Amino acid sequence: MTGFGGVKNVVVVGLGMTGLSVVKHLLRQPEALIVKVIDTRETPPGQEQLPEQVELHSGSWQQDWLLDADLIVTNPGIALASSQLQPAIKKGTPVVGDIELFAWAVTAPVIAITGSNGKSTVTDLTGEMANAAGVKTAVGGNIGFAALDLLEQDADLYVLELSSFQLETTSSLKLKAAAFLNLSEDHMDRYQGMEDYRQAKLRVFDHADVCIVNRDDKETYPDTADKTLISFGFDTSDEYGCIEENGRLFLAKNNTPIIAANELGLVGKHNIANSLVALALLDAAGVNTNKTLDTLKRYNGLTHRCQVVAEMNGVRWVNDSKATNVASTLAALSGLSIEGKLHLLVGGVGKGADFSELSPALNELDLMMYCFGEDGVQFMPLDPRSRLCQTMDEAIELLSPELTFGDMVMLSPACASFDQYTNFMARGDAFTALAKHYSTEK
């Protein structure tokens, strides 16, 4: 199914920003669709923006609507395996997500990025670089704007971040280039295991002209041999990698230097990889990357991702709230340069993760670890230099008297936020406010 042929009744599951974008898009179609919305929340966000002709059922599921639908457009947070969707699926009703609707409508080239970690940075950076090269580019998907809202920008290139959840309900998205950055344990409360999770991610390559894969993570390679691959890694390579010349490390293509690593606006080894991917994606999409190097030099990253939010008396406060899994926190720890002690804040909702992978990195650092939230206690056995707190506020109140010149306070929780916060952004904003408060205290 790649269009609305034969469709009359459409049920949208889940409102919010994405759900509203779906409703608006459906009502713009010439087929005069009848659109209904189901949201299990009593007062769904965005309900006041629904047009009068769109009926809303809130507070519970509405099975009759689902069984009568010709098409169901579901929120990425709802698994296809859920008992509520299964009766309609077994009946043969198509169930898609907003990215599939985007695929039906888009006419300009599209680039997509997925992976366990780094995808937001790569997506944002790729968009910035493309715009700098003179290509009118729209960026969104799992970051910023909902994909369907991007269509209103009438861009010449679309750059999408796609989560595994979004890819589950996407089957016809044609891409000029797609990148699978890395694979590490995440969302084990949703998937049966790592291979199930990997297969969801690999769907990004289904209709991609070029597949960007990680030489240091073979799990990112497609299972079939009929794909055009371009790889990136930290080694010397005929593709995208690193070389050393005159004692300096350079990002390179075909063993030819592109830009020195110490000229990048982003810091940390993982951001060398992120920059290589952005270059590979744009090159595959036909964008002149020579015009993008100044952007690589000035781009300093996303809010909530290893972002210095306050600095006073030699103490830096770093907001890495977007580190919602173990691999993200490991990446943050591997790129650190600290004169004094690291005060690390971890915890939240662990999503079934194995936190023991953090132990080797923790052992290498002079630190105190403050464990808070629903699964904070699970971090305590990892290191004897740990303290258990109920909340992040309590943790910062505890550590603030101990701060000295050269120390760093870092929120890199390795967990989701929804036990105590609406989302990772709200958690990061709360940390930033606390950082500024304690940095200015007399």
Swiss-Prot record:
EC number: 6.3.2.9
Gene this protein is translated from: murD
Pathway noted in the entry: Cell wall biogenesis; peptidoglycan biosynthesis
Reaction(s) catalysed by this chain's protein: UDP-N-acetyl-alpha-D-muramoyl-L-alanine + D-glutamate + ATP = UDP-N-acetyl-alpha-D-muramoyl-L-alanyl-D-glutamate + ADP + phosphate + H(+)
UniProt family annotation: Belongs to the MurCDEF family.
InterPro entries: Mur-like_cat_sf, Mur_ligase_C, Mur_ligase_C_dom_sf, Mur_ligase_cen, MurD
Gene Ontology terms: biological process: cell division; cell wall organization; peptidoglycan biosynthetic process; regulation of cell shape
Protein's recorded name: UDP-N-acetylmuramoylalanine--D-glutamate ligase
Location of this chain's protein in the cell: Cytoplasm
Keywords: ATP-binding, Cell cycle, Cell division, Cell shape, Cell wall biogenesis/degradation, Cytoplasm, Ligase, Nucleotide-binding, Peptidoglycan synthesis
Cysteine disulfide links: none
Protein's UniProt keywords contain Chloroplast: no
Molecular-function GO terms, alphabetical: ATP binding; UDP-N-acetylmuramoylalanine-D-glutamate ligase activity
